[in-house]
Amino acid sequence: MYINIFLRSNTFIFLFFLYLLPSCLVSAQSSNKGIIFEGAYTLDLATNLKGGVDQGSAYLGNIDLTFTFDTEKLGFWKNGRFFVYLLNNHGNSLSDLIGDFQIVNNIEANSNSRLYEFWYEHRLKSIKFIIGQHDLNSVFAITEAGRFFINSSFGIQPDISANVLTSIFPLSGLGAIISLKINSNLQLTNAIYDGDPGTEVSNPNSLKWSLNKNDGAFFIHEFSYEIKKDSITHSTYKLGIWNHLQKQIFKGIQKQNSQGIYFIGDKKLTQLEDVDKGVEIFTQVGFSLNQYNPIKSYWGGGFVYHGIFSNRENDAGGIAIAHSRFSDYYQSQFSMDKLQSETAIEISYEFVFSNPLVLKPNVQYIINPGTNTSIPNALMALVRMSYSW
């Protein structure tokens, strides 16, 4: 079954990845000369076992290729670097089988190759600037523990991603970011992004840069506070606010601004000699301040246990829950059954066989997929295989 799905996908992309593999083995040699080449291939084999729109299988693939150029090591100016990120996605849709709103898989996208990021960063003591085509979620609204999981909501939470067009996977846009390190614990980061980077149909390769007043702009501000012990971070708390300026029409009424606020917390519960081992927990909370947005509020949280078994100290396992609550407007317009929420429960375990090779079995149970009572609760399972260098 999976073989047939794979053969219908962009097989040549996978073969091209294999062709590049030998060059990856010598990428570290370039780092001393100011150029770092890194990459990863992620393969998901997934099945919707029960419920949802339909039972069936899906194959999803993701190739990341990144290039970092250090201006000082290359013989130019100090404190600068250029970053280029090439991205390819291939396969088919898992959410089409499930019918969920939050998107169960964080690498799901249309099959295509794109220039995902291209930006310049400059550092001046406690201030850092970034300008260019940039992924908002590489800086803002990040939970380090939540990144362990596969559901999209644990990456970029849906009170942002589902409510506005902005610069996130799989399509980034132009942006400018300034980050100020106030002290060793507190940091303030501000940014402005293109208010409409396009869609996977209108801008499939992320090469169409268009800035005009009709696109509006996306502003985001985030305070980040770290609690450290012996120079090691044990807790991080983030408070963010965003404002999307773009004219939208609802029920014949023109609305321009869309705002939201969020909080994220990461904390290590166990204080072991090896700081990479033990239990860490995370929480995400977000609210939309615009009554016309689809998502009114979001809550997510969970835990990850690193080094559960003494004979597999690099493995990790965890459980997480993502709960999105829909606005009255969305329910009145799009939810015939007036369901108020969708919830995803995820269980994941990661086998680390070597530094670059990881195998991650994953199970998710989706309650009220797409807020539609005609779609039964869904149970899906997948295995993620990833190789990085």
What are the residue ranges of the model-derived segments?
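Membrane-embedded beta-strand positions of outer-membrane beta-barrel proteins
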Residues: 37-39, 82-86, 129-131, 178, ...
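Residue-level signature of outer-membrane beta-barrel architecture
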Residues: 30, 43, 69-75, 121-124, ...
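Outer membrane beta-barrel transmembrane domains
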Residues: 201-210, 222-224, 240-259, 266, ...
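Outer membrane beta-barrel
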Residues: 56, 60-195, 293-297, 302, ...
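Short loop/turn motifs that connect adjacent beta-strands in outer-membrane beta-barrel proteins
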Residues: 27-37, 70-82, 126, 185, ...
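Outer-membrane beta-barrel "beta-signal"
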Residues: 377-389
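Transmembrane beta-strand segments of Gram-negative outer membrane beta-barrel proteins
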Residues: 30-49, 82-86, 92, 152, ...
